[in-house]
Curated annotation (Swiss-Prot):
Keyword Ribosomal protein in annotation: no
Annotated protein name in UniProt: Uncharacterized protein Rv2100
InterPro entries the UniProt entry points to: DUF222 (IPR003870), HNH_nuc (IPR003615)
Signal peptide per UniProt: 1-13
Record-stated family: To M.tuberculosis Rv3776.
Upper taxonomic lineage: Bacteria, Bacillati, Actinomycetota, Actinomycetes, Mycobacteriales
Any GO CC annotation of this UniProt entry: peptidoglycan-based cell wall
Domain of life: Bacteria
Keywords associated with the record: Signal
Keyword Signal recorded: yes
Region (Disordered): 312-358
Length: 550
């Protein structure tokens, strides 16, 4: 599924709206122009000369650079706001699953090398420049930092009445600079005090505990093969989970080398794999606990792509258990020695940079790989397709799809890191003109697959080694390489060079009918969410508006 559909006129004027209010734009840019001209006359010291500066000069340089950085951030957001205004607008495609907003977010994401979601967040933040022109003027002049502006934009997001927003903008612009160095919670309280004065129904109540239920998984730690986990649950669910993890942790024999905390953590992984018990780690065939099968490993498929010797690695005995005893401190111990971490009991074995990549893109070190193999993980050898002929159908075979996913590891759009497992296999040159061949196939998440298929502004060219060269609607080009190149530099992924394909006319009307549709347009969804969150203040407003009791 690849091709071209609509070529929107990106140069067309945006309908009247926040981004096209001449008064707002004049206020923001005129105030900023004089301030920025003065600011950039600051003589910032050369980094090589800082060693000759006194402490006062160093602190002054830090402050000046912070102002310049804030002004630059404001200008970056101004450019994002302008681009958003040019790309979005009322259109018959507003109910498309991949709409004009997504088109703009794709350009921002590629330019900043960030994810689609983060780019969309930057776009929402940029719109606050015109919602709050007086605050924006301070930001553009470097008098407010990006952190403070972001908090103001978030806390005032529910204010939609123009008069209340104007009063709030003036009040925040007058007082924000005098708040000084406050923590985020204190800044929120200071901002909320003004919102409560001018539009109490717009107070953010989304931090109510029940509404903040979430479970987050952090970025993998490539050295340790672990990832952070945090979140908020209903108290009853948390109690059940806590009790269940403890029960599973105590279900192993006394010879299990792991601590109780480590067993509880492993028990959560076992629950995720659908197990009702935690496999014992004693390694004894006659373990009295009878919990020998590790369901966590049974749910893992190891794709061998380069060096099969990694499969022979041995489990690390020091991955579990208590920390080794620290070296004793003596009167002769130096401060440097006291602060230096204790060495590991045994030096870790040297392995290739990466032997296993998880679906989330994290690296699993060889010792952990050995643990998974010992627990019964499935091993699959990825076959290189070589110079085989193209497959005669649209959908690639399982083996070909496996090669493409292992080669790419993630979505190939610039800045996107959706794991290949959850991506579509996209024909770079549209089928049937483009063959089902590894030199013409890549991973694309559903959002970017739709973007490329239904919007002709984006074009891509794929090279035999898997390199993809993207061209944005604005003419900028971005080159992405297969993710395996980073982790498996010796794996030869180059396949046959394909003849150049010709382009044919696309039946725009017919293909447009295939675009998935939204239940509500983005604008309608935004209005629904704002109204729903404002409704959380109804009880507060009713109590606040009660007449005096006398």
């Amino acid at each position: 599924m690849a091709g071209a559909l609509f070529e929107p006129s990106f140069a067309a004027a945006h309908p009247a709206g926040l981004l096209r209010r001449p008064v707002t734009r004049t206020v923001v840019l005129s105030v900023a122009a004089t301030s920025i001209a003065h600011m950039f006359e600051i003589s910032l010291p050369d980094p090589t000369e800082l060693c000759r500066s006194d402490d006062g000069a160093l602190v002054a340089a830090i402050e000046d650079c912070a102002r310049v950085e804030a002004a630059a951030s404001a200008r970056r957001l101004s450019a994002i706001a302008e681009l958003t205004g040019r790309r979005t607008g009322a259109d018959q495609r507003a109910d498309w699953a991949c709409d004009f907003w997504d088109c703009a977010a794709a350009e921002v994401a590629a330019a900043l090398t960030i994810s689609h979601g983060k780019a969309s967040g930057q776009m929402h933040l940029s719109l606050a420049l015109n919602r709050l022109p007086q605050v924006a003027a301070l930001f553009l002049a470097g008098h407010l930092g990006a952190r403070l502006f972001s908090i103001i934009a978030w806390r005032t997001y529910l204010v939609r009445d123009p008069h209340a927003l104007s009063l709030l903008d003036a009040a925040l612009a007058e007082h924000a600079g005098a708040w000084g160095p406050l923590s985020a919670p204190k800044l929120e309280k200071a901002i909320d005090s003004w919102i409560d004065r001018y539009d109490p129904g717009a107070l953010r109540r989304s931090r109510i505990s029940a509404r903040t239920r979430d479970l987050c998984i952090g970025d993998p730690d490539e050295d340790a093969g672990t990832a952070a986990l945090w979140g908020r649950l209903y108290a009853t669910d948390a109690a059940m989970l806590d009790r269940r993890l403890t029960e599973m942790a105590h279900g192993v024999c006394e010879d299990d080398p792991r601590t109780l905390a480590q067993r509880r953590a492993d028990a959560l992984g076992a629950l995720a794999a659908g197990a009702d018990h935690l496999a014992c780690g004693c390694g004894k065939p006659d373990c009295p606990s009878g919990a020998g099968n590790d369901e966590r490993a049974a749910g893992v498929v190891i794709h061998v792509v380069a060096d099969a010797s990694a499969l022979d690695a041995q489990p690390d005995p020091h991955l579990s258990g208590d920390e080794p005893p620290s070296r004793p401190l003596t009167p002769e111990t130096t401060l440097f020695e006291a602060l230096t971490p204790d060495p590991e009991p045994d030096p870790p074995a040297t392995h290739a940079p990466a032997e296993l990549i998880t679906t989330g893109g994290g690296v699993v070190p060889a010792p952990l790989l050995a643990e998974l193999i010992r627990g019964g993980a499935t091993i699959s050898q990825v076959r290189h397709p070589g110079d085989l002929a193209a497959e005669p159908h649209y959908r690639p075979s399982a083996k070909l799809a496996e090669f493409v996913r292992m080669r790419d590891l993630t979505c190939r759009f610039p800045g996107c890191d959706v794991p290949a497992e959850f991506c579509d296999i996209d024909h770079s040159a549209p089928w049937p003109l483009g063959p089902t061949h590894p030199s013409n196939l890549k991973c694309a998440c559903r959002k970017h697959h739709l973007l490329k298929t239904f919007w002709t502004g984006w074009r891509d060219v794929q090279l035999p080694d898997g390199t993809v060269i993207w061209t944005a609607p604005n003419g900028h080009t971005y080159t992405t390489h297969p993710g395996s190149r980073i982790f498996f530099p010796t794996w030869h992924t180059t396949t046959a060079e394909l003849p150049q394909t010709s382009t044919a006319a696309v039946n725009v009307d017919a293909r447009g009918l295939m675009m998935p549709r939204r239940r509500r347009t983005r604008a309608a969804e935004l209005a629904h969410r704002i109204n729903a969150e404002r409704a959380l203040n109804d009880a507060y407003m009713a109590e606040r508006n009660k007449p005096p009791s006398f």
